[in-house]
Each structure stands twice: as structure tokens, then as C-alpha cells.
UniProtKB/Swiss-Prot annotation:
Predominant place of localization: membrane
Family as reported in the entry's similarity comment: Belongs to the TLCD5 family.
PROSITE patterns per the UniProt record, alphabetical: TLC
Location in the cell: Membrane
Membrane topology: Multi-pass membrane protein
Xref: Pfam families: TRAM_LAG1_CLN8
Keywords: Membrane, Transmembrane, Transmembrane helix
Record-annotated TLC domain positions: 28-219
Transmembrane segment boundaries: 3-23, 37-57, 74-94, 109-129, 154-174, 190-210
Organism the protein comes from: Danio rerio (Zebrafish)
Cellular component GO terms, alphabetical: membrane
Protein name: TLC domain-containing protein 5
Length: 242
């Protein structure tokens, strides 16, 4: 336990140091800009680490849930735990996120603590982290495009489309398969299975919000296209009369 506290504290301090360093280097930017950079770095790092764990180091999470944690899994989980503690504290202090996102962070923290405390189910926890973070770079890119005034462009449309497709296919599609394997396997403990159901339910809450956003954006673009089409028709008719 003392070693775990030291490791988690080192992880938390490392993320805090990175944030403070970015604040120093980007003094012209606000705190959220620098926090988003930390979030982006964490997302890319965890995607790479969990992809290596799942696809190369093994074991395969769909066939071996509930197995004993490996050193590399523990390292990845501790790194991510430190980040979520940092980001949770930052979000609460600056009041930038709503209850759903705070619930996601809380579940992530407890899920990682559970896997580390039990000494097992690290592989499926890493798989969940991979699914959660795979859309993170796109989410941050969307925010940065908005801040730079470039969101209402082809780049913004591409980022949104890729985000929706990735979220639906990985977090909902692959996530459904992962949850099924978790629930049907006799190895994972009951509390881990309950946690898996909770995370999956939260993913569906996000999915409903994303679907509503997609409908609003599509309808808005269609209305603007129709208005532009009518305007072009009127202008063309006026030219013919002249």
C-alpha cells in the first residue's frame, strides 16, 4: 500500500508539473488551453500503451478477463490514475465540466483503483481505457478548432464525423462485446462486472447526447444549404430579367 501511494503521488505530481510547465511556456494562453494540451498528451500516451498491452503484450482482453495484472498494466493504470486525479481536481476547481463528465472521471478513478486493489482485471481495465481515450484526440481537436475560429469549416466537419464514427464503433460496438465477455466469464469478480455495466451505461448516455448533436448539426447544415440554394435561384432569375 505505501508503494502504491508513492507511485500514484509521483504520477499525479508528474501531470501537475506538465500542466505548470505548459502554463509557463504558453503564458499567453488561458488555463483551459494548457489543461487541454495535458489531456491530449494523456490520451495519445494511453492509446499507445493500452494498444501495446492489448495487441502485442497480451493477454487478449476478450478471452482472458479477470487475469492477474502484469507490471506493464499496473504502470499504465497508475499513469492514468494520476492524470484522472489531476483532471478531476482541475475540473472541480475551475467548474468547467457538467455532472456527466465528472461521473465519468469518478468511475474511471474507482475502476482503476479497483483493478489495482484486487490485483486482477487489469487487462480489461486497460481495454476500457483504450476505448475511452481513442476518441480523445478528436475531442480536443474539436475544442482547439473552436478556440481558433476554424470549427465551421471542412476540418471541423471531418473531426466531428470521425469522432461520431469512432465513438459508435469502439465504445458502443466493441464495448458491447467487451461487456458480454466480462459478464459471461467466471473469472472477474462481481464488483468488476458491476463497474463494467456502469461504464457501459455511461457510454450510452454520451452516445445519446452525441446523436442529438449530430441531428442538430445535420439539420442546421441542411437548412443553410436550402436557404443558399433558394438565394442562388433568386439571384439567377434576377440576372436573366436584366
Amino acid at each position: 500500500m505505501p508503494l502504491f501511494i508513492v507511485e500514484t503521488s509521483c504520477s499525479l505530481i508528474s501531470w501537475l508539473f506538465l500542466y505548470l510547465l505548459l502554463c509557463h511556456l504558453n503564458s499567453g494562453r488561458d488555463s483551459e488551453w494548457n489543461c487541454r494540451l495535458v489531456t491530449l498528451f494523456h490520451g495519445i500516451l494511453i492509446i499507445c500503451l493500452t494498444a501495446y498491452i492489448g495487441f502485442i503484450a497480451g493477454p487478449w482482453p476478450f478471452t482472458h478477463p479477470g487475469t492477474e495484472n502484469t507490471y506493464f498494466q499496473i504502470l499504465t493504470l497508475v499513469l492514468s490514475l494520476g492524470y484522472f486525479l489531476f483532471d478531476m481536481a482541475w475540473c472541480v476547481y475551475f467548474r468547467t465540466e457538467g455532472p456527466v463528465m465528472l461521473a465519468h472521471h469518478t468511475m474511471s478513478i474507482f475502476g482503476i483503483l479497483l483493478a489495482l486493489g484486487l490485483g486482477e482485471s487489469g487487462i480489461e481495465t486497460c481495454a476500457v481505457l483504450f476505448g475511452s481515450e481513442i476518441t480523445n484526440p478528436l475531442l480536443q481537436a474539436r475544442w482547439f478548432l473552436k478556440r481558433m475560429g476554424c470549427y465551421d469549416s471542412l476540418a471541423g466537419d471531418v473531426v466531428d464525423l470521425l469522432f461520431i464514427l469512432l465513438f459508435a464503433s469502439v465504445r458502443i460496438g466493441v464495448g458491447s462485446r467487451m461487456l458480454y465477455c466480462e459478464l459471461t466469464s467466471p473469472k472477474p469478480s462481481l464488483i468488476v462486472k458491476v463497474g463494467g455495466v456502469a461504464i457501459y451505461t455511461l457510454s450510452w448516455i454520451f452516445m445519446v447526447d452525441i446523436a442529438r448533436f449530430a441531428c442538430r448539426k445535420t439539420c442546421g447544415k441542411y437548412r443553410r444549404w436550402k436557404e443558399q440554394y433558394k438565394l442562388d435561384g433568386v439571384n439567377g432569375h434576377a440576372v436573366k430579367i436584366k
